[in-house]
Amino acid sequence: MLQDKLLVIKCKCGNKDAMYRIYGKYKDFLLTLARGLTGEQELAEDIVHDVFVNFALSIKKFRLTGSLKGYLATCVSNLARDRIRTRIRQSAIIDLVMENDCESNNPSRKLIETEEIIKLRDALEQIPYEQREVILLHIKAGMKFREIAALQNQSLSTIHGRYRYGI
């Protein structure tokens, strides 16, 4: 956290290397989060890119009061939510696809894993976005319930409830 504050101060002074280091430090985490929330690699990359562009453009006014990781995760989550809402309004169809993590070379095993991923994706599409978001943040991004509660500005019991009902 102290290192993040120092990097932010350097960014405010125009140090491009500091911004690059922040990007390198958090991009994988934020990409995993965005991919889990949207289900699409390209959209996730766009969201993370836009978050960092906005962060860089507003760095002069930025004040780090908590965790930089938490702040950036909130930005990614909010932007992902906005993009999904925009899509729903525009097309009225949600086309969320989880990344296929099948790494098996065995064709029958790969088929089973693919079927399981399809079932999981279908199940996730059936639950409300708020529950899906909590489940993916906890399982896919590895965030603790307290972190999710802080990220979403909700009580811990609300987050536990969303997770429990979603599962």
Protein language model regions, located:
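Arg/Lys-rich amphipathic alpha helix in sigma70-family domain 2
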Residues: 60-64, 74-94, 113
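Sigma70-family region 2
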Residues: 12-13, 50-67
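Short helix-capping/turn signature of helix-turn-helix
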Residues: 25-27, 36-37, 136-143, 153
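Amphipathic, Lys/Arg- and hydrophobic-enriched alpha-helical face
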Residues: 23-41, 58, 124
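N-terminal module of bacterial RNA polymerase sigma factors
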Residues: 1-29, 36
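DNA-recognition helix of helix-turn-helix
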Residues: 77, 81, 131, 140, ...
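Internal acidic/polar
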Residues: 1, 90-117
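C-terminal flanking helix
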Residues: 27, 31, 52, 128, ...
